[in-house]
Regions:
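Non-catalytic, mostly N-terminal accessory regions of nucleic-acid modification and defense proteins
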Residues: 1-233, 312-336, 341
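SAM-dependent methyltransferase catalytic region
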Residues: 193, 197-384
């Protein structure tokens, strides 16, 4: 995916380690592509303002676009295996080696499909992304800065083939599958970082902290911690050893939630607690858990998005299993925060100081805030 996205950017005149082609010199772009080029430039400039050098900003953008599409496809595979959506990825012989949705689309749009290299799959995927984004914007928002570039048909088909053939359906049913993919994706960057550790001037930059410090906690550790914290609190409440509370008043927060392994396990525990309490129906409980009980923070935006995604899938799974409507549009309330920020720097910071140059109090406040948040991507939720 990354090599493919890099080539797509080259088609837009954007290079790594080479000057960019001026937009007015790109005569072959359509009006839509010209707008895409402008939006891609803005996204890369935003990364530069966050501290990346220009070439590294381009590389980071490529990585984020690739990661976005990989996770979208993985999420679709999880949902189709769980029966939450009709199959759109996996091809079946009975559907003419197309997916169920693909075959239905082909029946009504044969001419369109014939002229598309992927048989219309890319078009279908965008429709599905837009539909899911109506329920959860995280990761599926087709108007975000990482959606202006679309992988080639060949690349998409290759990734889909790998997801459908190299990972069995039972594995896709596991709650941890999204976290495993997240860990694998970051393990490559982590390995690259530690190959430099014997260098004399080796150091880990703030931008490398998320990938370097992430550890996927084994199930038995997660279960042990949840059993000796959340489960213990509830048990003590039931046995009169602790003041009794309604389940919706019990809060659990993971200040470095990663891809949500602890929160997913806590979700199951809270669900059983609500069922035992008996105040709400099984159609209400999933929403109550997200609204009242589960909270997560991380310095990695992608980790936060993936946590939101798996909690979204978890909610739809519980609703489906108990015979309730799985359309969550307008009903989800997810308490997740990315403890990250892009500080003003360069000219923008100087303009702010100039604006308040006659107010020493405000200037001092700007100085203090800037110092506190200078390493926000490192400190995360430790900042008070």
């Amino acid at each position: 995916l990354e090599k493919d996205i890099e080539q797509v950017l080259i088609n837009y005149g954007i290079y790594i380690n080479k000057g960019w082609v001026n937009l007015r010199d790109l005569k072959n772009l359509t009006e839509e592509q010209e707008n895409n080029r402008k939006n891609i430039e803005k996204a890369i400039e935003k990364l530069e303002k966050g501290g990346f050098e220009k070439d590294k900003a381009v590389m980071e953008y490529i990585k984020e676009v690739s990661y976005t599409y990989l996770n979208r496809l993985a999420a679709l595979r999880v949902m189709e295996v769980r029966g939450l959506i009709d199959e759109i990825l996996v091809p079946r012989g009975e559907h003419g080696n197309r997916s169920f949705i693909g075959s239905r689309f082909y029946e009504v749009a044969r001419e369109f499909c014939k002229y598309e290299m992927d048989g219309g799959l890319g078009y279908l995927l965008n429709i599905m992304f837009e539909e899911i984004s109506e329920e959860i914007k995280m990761l599926f928002n087709t108007e975000d800065e990482y959606s202006f570039v679309t992988p080639s048909s060949a690349s998409l088909l290759k990734v889909i083939e790998l997801l459908c053939t190299n990972i069995d359906e039972e594995t896709w049913r596991q709650d941890e599958i999204i976290g495993w993919i997240y860990q694998y994706f970051n393990s490559i960057e982590k390995s690259e970082i530690f190959t430099r550790q014997n260098q004399k001037d080796f150091f880990i930059s703030v931008d490398e902290v998320p990938a370097t410090t992430q550890i996927f906690t084994p199930d038995w550790v997660v279960n042990w911690i949840i059993d000796n914290s959340l489960n213990k609190v509830y048990s003590e409440m039931k046995n009169g050893l602790r003041g009794k509370k309604n389940v919706e008043d019990i809060k659990l927060i993971d200040p470095c939630c990663g891809s949500g392994h602890f929160l997913v396990r806590a979700y199951d525990v809270f669900y059983e607690m609500y069922v035992e309490e008996g105040k709400y129906t099984k159609g209400e409980i999933p929403y109550k858990i997200l609204e009242n009980n589960i909270h997560g923070i991380d310095i990695d935006l992608r980790a936060v998005q993936l946590t939101g995604l798996i909690l979204f899938i978890k909610t739809k799974t519980y609703l489906k299993e108990n015979g309730y409507d799985t359309n969550t549009q307008g009903k989800l309330s997810v308490n997740l925060v990315c403890a990250d920020a892009i500080l003003l720097n360069g000219r923008r910071l100087e303009d702010l100081k100039e604006k308040h140059k006659d107010n020493k109090t405000i200037l001092k406040m700007i100085e203090i805030i800037y110092e506190e948040f200078e390493d926000v991507r490192l400190k995360g939720s430790l900042i008070q």
